[in-house]
């Protein structure tokens, strides 16, 4: 029997037995079985704590629960997304990811890069949101989204100030939020610092809808809704991040290929048709063509005019090649343009501008528009 001694409280303190127990416990902890036992216990505790409590454990000291501390640096590895096709009788299901574009910081509230007019309507025929999917969807009459998720991926330093918000609006004809109060009242909305990645799951409703390959009076019949990205509170106009859309969609009812060319016209008998790649505004001295999304475009413009003077780009648009000729009461211009961000534009200047006809389609830079 091990020797023991009595303390002032008449309690027994096991000396030799305590030392022996400590040695045995240490041996168990250092053994493979002991290490596995300990880690299993830790994982069990973490599972019981729940997700929010686990976040509290790994966040920086002094950071309140639910907050995110700014790291020295972070990044996201973006890898190629290969579309997945699943075929069934009369339909095809596609899962893919696409890039909507790059966005810049701003001091005041700027929504969708400053481009208005329900830019990001969720319809597979909308080339601004689905530049890759649109070419496939043009061969079908109906669609149904099974999953839609927005992902904001930062590309700025953690010293960048401001806020970035992404949102979903079920009514695709609502105007964009005009201030922070309207933005904060969105039913589906998430917001973070520019350097913080964020995601938003868009609710889907298992409803079959028609493609919007022509002029539709009520867009609520053809669109799932609209999405948007807003920036504010920044101290610069630096690029802050990219917006991606992840989706799973089922296409129904194959049809002859719909037009991938947009036609815009003015004057009596005008018949706009096709996709919605640009917006056009014109007066007696200028015609401005604004690109709703990034990409390379081929434009063919004919317009009545007394004279034509210059062609100017703005907002990140670049002329790759062009030919513009003036003869008599009209001028004609064909141009290959790259728009780097939503809202890039090209302006035609002259005198006594009148009716116009414009054709727009997506292209490659190698589609040279120069007259040789």
Swiss-Prot record:
Keywords: Capsid protein, T=3 icosahedral capsid protein, Virion. It is found in: Virion. GO terms for molecular function: structural molecule activity. PROSITE patterns: ICOSAH_VIR_COAT_S (PS00555). It comes from the Viruses. Coiled coil: none annotated. Pfam families: Viral_coat. Its main location: virion. The keyword Transcription does not apply. GO terms for cellular component: T=3 icosahedral viral capsid. Belongs to the icosahedral plant coat protein family. Capsid protein self-assembles to form an icosahedral capsid with a T=3 symmetry, about 32-35 nm in diameter, and consisting of 180 capsid proteins. This is Capsid protein. It comes from Pothos latent virus (isolate Pigeonpea/India).
